[in-house]
């Protein structure tokens, strides 16, 4: 049974609350753009592609409800303004993720174009928006499978030759980039899924991904769900793993929240360190991201705003109480793991320089550096 993180049917949306994973499966209904803003900001849903999809669909659900109740304005311009204001509001929930901003901009242009038509009603503008949002959901799953296939083929060609394991490769990934971070299948984790399906995966390794533990809570959950051979490591074990030749790690594959025009990549904190380790150990380092994550308006990583999260996300940890062997898991509790009064710096992302990246996997192929040693990402939009 496939893992479903975003459940949508016309007029209804619910999300798998990722704050409770892996111990509890709870779906939260989303009725409005306001609901989506809080779900995204609180990280009940996360992952750049997923939050863009949830943002888009939340407004589709809100518009559908207004239509059904007869509360939507008949004036096309009024509905256009309503939609654009809601999109701007949702986009403020997670500023680093370019997919969210890109989706808001793209959907805004669609409703502006529709509202300019002669004799167009407010309902027709809303229905045009709903169709566009639903198509985003459909396209995301298709794009993720493309990323998985292209990435797996590249790794099989480029990385397996130098890895031990008789035609198979071990892959290390960071944070969560699977079905829980997208509309389905995943980006970097989609590459691992495709390698596994092709019988070319020796083993998958996932980092714990402190301080929010997306690796141990979410990626490990997906790997176990899909019966993919995998091992969890702490973030600080990555160097030792790459030095351990018998592990056969031939590639590190990560996702992205924003890729600048020159290839500099903002991703979960700790990604930059993994790229440095990969370069030192001669391991391929790949970024897996749809074209919607590439921001051609941002020239380099210096122009990417880095979100900082609350100190409590580093100094506290939440999970179920562990009882005796027969008792299983108890009630959820929050405990502190840091000295009271210590200062905290908690950036959610870091920026990996393009010079450390071997390839950027998109839904239309893998982009490598040209002879000049630079990525020319404008070509993926031609």
Swiss-Prot record:
Site residues by UniProt (Transition state stabilizer): 175
**Catalytic activity annotation:** 5-(methylsulfanyl)-alpha-D-ribose 1-phosphate = 5-(methylsulfanyl)-D-ribulose 1-phosphate
Which keywords does this Swiss-Prot/TrEMBL entry list?
Amino-acid biosynthesis, Cytoplasm, Isomerase, Methionine biosynthesis, Nucleus
Tell me its EC number(s), please.
5.3.1.23
Active-site residues per Swiss-Prot or TrEMBL entry = 257 (proton donor)
Q: In which pathway does it act?
A: Amino-acid biosynthesis; L-methionine biosynthesis via salvage pathway; L-methionine from S-methyl-5-thio-alpha-D-ribose 1-phosphate: step 1/6
Its subcellular locations are: Cytoplasm; Nucleus
Domain of life per record: Eukaryota
**Coiled coil location:** none
**GO BP terms:** L-methionine salvage from methylthioadenosine
**SUPFAM superfamilies, per database record:** NagB/RpiA/CoA transferase-like
Gene Ontology CC: one annotated term: cytoplasm
GO molecular function of the protein, one example? S-methyl-5-thioribose-1-phosphate isomerase activity
Which protein family is named in the record? Belongs to the eIF-2B alpha/beta/delta subunits family. MtnA subfamily.
- Function per UniProt: Catalyzes the interconversion of methylthioribose-1-phosphate (MTR-1-P) into methylthioribulose-1-phosphate (MTRu-1-P).
HAMAP family associated with the record: Salvage_MtnA (MF_01678)
Identification of the protein by name? Methylthioribose-1-phosphate isomerase
Native source species: Paracoccidioides brasiliensis (strain Pb18)
Q: Lineage in the entry?
A: Eukaryota, Fungi, Dikarya, Ascomycota, Pezizomycotina
Q: Which gene encodes it?
A: MRI1
């Amino acid at each position: 049974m496939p893992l479903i993180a975003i459940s949508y049917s016309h007029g209804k949306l619910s999300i798998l609350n990722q704050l409770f994973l892996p111990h509890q499966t709870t779906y939260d209904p989303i009725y409005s753009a306001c609901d989506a803003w809080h779900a995204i900001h609180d990280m009940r849903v996360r992952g750049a592609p997923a939050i863009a999809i949830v943002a888009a669909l939340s407004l589709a659900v809100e518009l559908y409800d207004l239509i059904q109740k007869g509360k939507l304005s008949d004036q096309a311009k009024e509905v256009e303004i309503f939609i654009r204001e809601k999109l701007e509001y949702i986009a403020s929930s997670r500023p680093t993720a370019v997919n969210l901003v890109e989706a808001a901009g793209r959907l805004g242009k669609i409703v502006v174009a529709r509202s300019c038509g002669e004799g167009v009603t407010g309902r027709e503008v809303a229905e045009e928006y709903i169709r566009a949002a639903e198509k985003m959901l459909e396209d995301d799953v298709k794009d993720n499978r493309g990323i998985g296939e292209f990435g797996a083929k590249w790794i099989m060609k480029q990385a397996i030759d130098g890895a031990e394991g008789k035609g198979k490769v071990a892959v290390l990934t960071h944070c969560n980039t699977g079905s829980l971070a997208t509309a389905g299948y995943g980006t970097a984790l989609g590459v691992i899924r495709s390698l596994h399906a092709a019988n070319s995966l020796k083993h998958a390794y996932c980092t714990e991904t402190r301080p929010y533990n997306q690796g141990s809570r979410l990626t490990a959950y997906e790997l176990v769900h899909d019966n993919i051979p995998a091992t969890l490591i702490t973030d600080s074990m990555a160097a030792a793993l790459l030095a351990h030749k018998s592990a056969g790690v031939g590639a590190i594959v990560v996702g992205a929240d924003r890729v600048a025009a020159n290839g500099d990549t903002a991703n979960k904190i700790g990604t930059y360190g993994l790229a440095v380790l990969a370069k030192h150990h001669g391991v391929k380092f790949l970024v897996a991201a749809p074209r919607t994550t590439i921001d051609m308006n941002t020239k380099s990583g210096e122009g990417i705003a880095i979100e900082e999260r609350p100190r409590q996300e580093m100094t506290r940890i939440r999970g179920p109480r562990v009882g005796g062997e027969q008792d299983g898991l108890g009630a959820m509790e929050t405990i502190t793991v840091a000295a009271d009064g210590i200062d905290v710096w908690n950036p959610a992302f870091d920026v990996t320089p393009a010079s450390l990246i071997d390839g950027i996997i998109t839904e239309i192929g893998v982009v490598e550096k040209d002879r000049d040693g630079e990525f020319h990402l404008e070509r993926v939009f031609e």
